[in-house]
Amino acid sequence: MNQEKRDYCLNCIHKPCQLNGCPIKNRIPEFIKETDEEKAYEIVTSTSLLGAVCGRICPFSDQCEGVCTRGRIGEPVDIGGIEAEICDNAIKKGFKISKNINPELQSKKVAIIGGGPSGLECAGFLAREGVKVTIYEKHSELGGILTHGIPEFRLKKEITMQTINQILDLGIEVKYNQAIGENLNIEELQNQYDAIYLAIGANEPNITLKGNNIYSANELLEYRDFPDFKDKKVIVNGGGNVAMDAARTIKHLGGDVTIVYRRSESEMPASKEEIEETKADKVKMEYLTNIMEYEKNIVKCIKTELVELENSKRKVPKNIPNSEFELIADYIVLATGSLPNIKAIENFEKNEKGYIKVNEKYQTSLEKVFAGGDIIGTNSTVAFAVSDGLKASKEIKEFLLK
């Protein structure tokens, strides 16, 4: 690895990148300073088994690099780049994720429902201690949002599959085309396994607009079943990372894309990196705008202003009277949030937002069943999903050892 990159890190005593910036609490200063390549990989995988992925797609400016002490006097340390380089090098040189077998866990069986980032992390950390782990995945391949959400131009599938194979090499069994609420019964699994971790995400479309040629961004990105967007005018409604991914994907398919967002750019939940990359792709932005109706290619809009409301953490968009205007669109793609699959979680106690309710140990209302990631309403980034998987694996381990 480039020595200059290593030396740029100040090796701060307080480790803000690790303790304040990283949701997973990766041992960032340690893996940066470690000159032994295999030991550096060991440090990375002591907290995250998806370093090659997170090192490429994390919103660094909002997390580790955003609080980097170096960033106060210049550019922050390239933490993501270093992490990805360590993991890429490990795969090239055949380094494996280490095991730490606990004899008391070798007779235990755990089912992981959902093979996305959270499920993979939990599965890997249990398997490396000797637990017999089976992943149940609804698609014909693992990855979740990594393979059915994030576009190829942001994350190469080859990288994702190499990372997944490293985890599966720990001895994990996978059963594909298995979906809870369809051909997978939670009660039957409770009888077969000592514990279950539910990490199925929350990808059901939140369709808030009526009309033809309206699509869910989540569904388009998940199934890759795109209409012919070439030379068509497309509006993407939303301001998060999914909106940016959808807009850039449609732009790459030849569409004329405009993002419509009801707040200002500074209020966008998307990462700074994603917003800048979307602009670089020549996607147009229409801020402080609400879509009211869509009919026969006419999008009726109204301008908004942001107002402060008591008990609200964010300013709230308010329609401005007499500010209506129209846009033209052949298609509208909605990226205004997603919802849990109601059928899949019908037997669980829910929180006030409709997600599965868990306690501080990630336990649900069902016996032996834990849950994490988007399905419990966790912040929708890969790093937070991985963090849930790591924490849940520790809680499941303690549960199994009782």
Question: What positions do the PLM features span?
Answer:
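Ferredoxin-type iron-sulfur electron-transfer modules and their immediate structural context
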Residues: 1-109, 196-213, 329, 338-340, ...
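Glycine-rich dinucleotide-binding loop and its adjacent helix/turn
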Residues: 82, 86-104, 165-182, 205-253, ...
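N-terminal Rossmann-like FAD-binding beta1-loop-alpha1 element of flavoenzymes
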Residues: 110-132, 243-251
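FAD-site-proximal beta/loop scaffold in flavoenzymes
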Residues: 212-232, 312-379
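Rossmann-like dinucleotide-binding cores of NAD(P)H-dependent redox enzymes
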Residues: 132-135, 139-170, 174, 247-293
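Residue-level detector of alpha-helix initiation sites
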Residues: 49, 116-117, 141, 240-242, ...
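Feature captures the FAD/FMN-dependent oxidoreductase FAD-binding
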Residues: 109-111, 161-210, 292-300, 339
